[in-house]
Amino acid sequence: MFKEYKIYKFFEQVKQETYKVVWPTRKELVASTLVVVVAVFIFSLTCLVLDYSIHNIMQLLLNIGK
């Protein structure tokens, strides 16, 4: 009985807390999403350039002895 009450109390508190959440407006959500997409794109390009550079340097070093 007590355990069931604790579970009920927990979910009741979760419900109360969700009313306190300040949800973003659609404009804020779109802006934040755009920032994340651009940041991921820039990070991906950086990784691509670094990977390509390291690959070419390794190929150059491995082909020196041939």
Curated annotation (Swiss-Prot):
Record's GO cellular component terms:
plasma membrane
Record's keyword annotation contains Cell membrane: yes
Q: Does the keyword Membrane apply?
A: yes
As for membrane topology, the entry says: Single-pass membrane protein
Subcellular location, in the record's words? Cell inner membrane
UniProt keyword list: Cell inner membrane, Cell membrane, Membrane, Protein transport, Translocation, Transmembrane, Transmembrane helix, Transport
**One GO term of the biological process aspect:** protein targeting
**GO MF:** protein transmembrane transporter activity
Q: Which residues cross the membrane?
A: 29-49
Q: Which domain of life is it from?
A: Bacteria
Provide the function of this protein.
Essential subunit of the Sec protein translocation channel SecYEG. Clamps together the 2 halves of SecY. May contact the channel plug during translocation.
Stated family: Belongs to the SecE/SEC61-gamma family.
What does the record note on quaternary structure?
Answer: Component of the Sec protein translocase complex. Heterotrimer consisting of SecY, SecE and SecG subunits. The heterotrimers can form oligomers, although 1 heterotrimer is thought to be able to translocate proteins. Interacts with the ribosome. Interacts with SecDF, and other proteins may be involved. Interacts with SecA.
The protein's name in its UniProt record = Protein translocase subunit SecE
Q: What species is this protein from? A: Rickettsia rickettsii
Q: What is the lineage of its organism?
A: Bacteria, Pseudomonadati, Pseudomonadota, Alphaproteobacteria, Rickettsiales
**Which gene is this protein's source?**
secE
